[in-house]
Amino acid sequence: MHSEREESWRAELSALRAHDLWRELQVLQPAPERGPPTFVGTRGEPLLSFASNDYLGLSAESALRDAAIAEIQQSGVGAGAAPLLGGERPAHAVLANALARWLGVEAALLFGSGYLANLGVISTLVGRGDRVYADRLNHASLVDGVRLSGARLHRYRHGDMTHLAQWLERGGRGQAWIITDGVFSMDGDIAPLPELATLAQQYGAGIILDEAHAFGVLGTEGQGTAAHWNMDIHGVDVIMGTLGKAFGVYGAFVAGSQDVVDLLRNRARSFIYHTALPSALAAAALVALDLLRHGDARRERLTQHRQHLRAQVPDAPWLASETPIQGLLLGDARRALTVSAQLRRAGLYCPAVRPPTVPADSARLRITLSAAHSHDDIELLATTLREVL
């Protein structure tokens, strides 16, 4: 039996290699003279990264580092236990309250990661027998949350409100939920939230919105998709956000009504049974929130980077996106790997994204821009892309 298991594993690994879907971790050391987004590769080669979700360039901010160090000196490194068992630190409570005030909702709850937050929210609020209508390009954690809930999953074509309305019109038993990314992580486009809210109201559905790639980037004070569309945030029932992207830290949160947060605190297994976020990260995230709220100059720099890149490489197979996520659709996995390798030889780090992360025949380069990039960085990327595409 032991050899049969090993043979099965090896066969699966061989299939991954044969289909150009093999993955390996890359060790990148931040370059001492500049730090992110510049790194040193395993062979000592300098690399300029276009693969990070550190959209505002906050991860290397000294103010965040100082806040984390001060909290470590006071409270230690790890939280030591689950929040309901070992208790929160003041930094946790202050951050959660600040996040709720920022978004104009009643309460927020911290989680260890966005994946845990999405699993916890959906498996707690969505019941077996409920109906979930989800965009086909939603993040995997949203799909897994629905599977864990036992609800019936109906996936509508990406951004297709007519298809969603057709599903909703069929009705059925149980509560109805519309679940969507605010900014889609692989394509970079923005969910049509006003239309989603209209359909939700028409058919009595709730909305769960994952703002992982929207917070900090879109809207007034970086408040995300609803702010981008000038919508009242209260048209959304539950909001998830991460602290590891535009915030430049790590962790996640869920925001909404006090009842929603109370229910999650008492019922969400991924909250109850997870070790609390280190308070040093909460302290750093609180500083990041202030920088993010007042980060209009950083957001404007992102817009300028995006516009300049696309203007310099106008004939590239760009996906439609008004966010820092700029996808180059290459189709074939081997083609994506080849272009990625060519960029790396030129000192640019941008890994190929292949199935199952993206649908079949849609392998791509997922180029992510940061306010920490300089104009010269974008020029170098554009020049290299013109040479290799």
Swiss-Prot record:
Q: Residues where N6-(pyridoxal phosphate)lysine occurs? A: 245
Against SUPFAM superfamilies, the record matches this protein to: PLP-dependent transferases
Q: What is its EC number?
A: 2.3.1.47
Identify the metabolic or biological route this protein is part of. Cofactor biosynthesis; biotin biosynthesis
Q: InterPro entries from the entry? A: Aminotrans_II_pyridoxalP_BS, Aminotransferase_I/II_large, AON_synthase_class-II, AONS_Archaea/Proteobacteria, AONS_Proteobacteria, PyrdxlP-dep_Trfase, PyrdxlP-dep_Trfase_major, PyrdxlP-dep_Trfase_small
GO BP field:
biotin biosynthetic process
Q: Which reaction does it catalyse?
A: 6-carboxyhexanoyl-[ACP] + L-alanine + H(+) = (8S)-8-amino-7-oxononanoate + holo-[ACP] + CO2
Q: Record-annotated residues binding substrate?
A: 23, 139, 357
**Keyword line:** Biotin biosynthesis, Pyridoxal phosphate, Transferase
Which residues does the record give as pyridoxal 5'-phosphate binding sites? 114-115, 185, 213, 242
Q: Name one GO molecular function term.
A: pyridoxal phosphate binding
- Cofactor(s) needed by this chain: pyridoxal 5'-phosphate
Function per UniProt:
Catalyzes the decarboxylative condensation of pimeloyl-[acyl-carrier protein] and L-alanine to produce 8-amino-7-oxononanoate (AON), [acyl-carrier protein], and carbon dioxide.
The family this protein is said to belong to: Belongs to the class-II pyridoxal-phosphate-dependent aminotransferase family. BioF subfamily.
Q: How does it assemble?
A: Homodimer.
The protein in question is named 8-amino-7-oxononanoate synthase
The protein's organism comes out as Acidithiobacillus ferrooxidans (strain ATCC 23270 / DSM 14882 / CIP 104768 / NCIMB 8455)
The gene is bioF
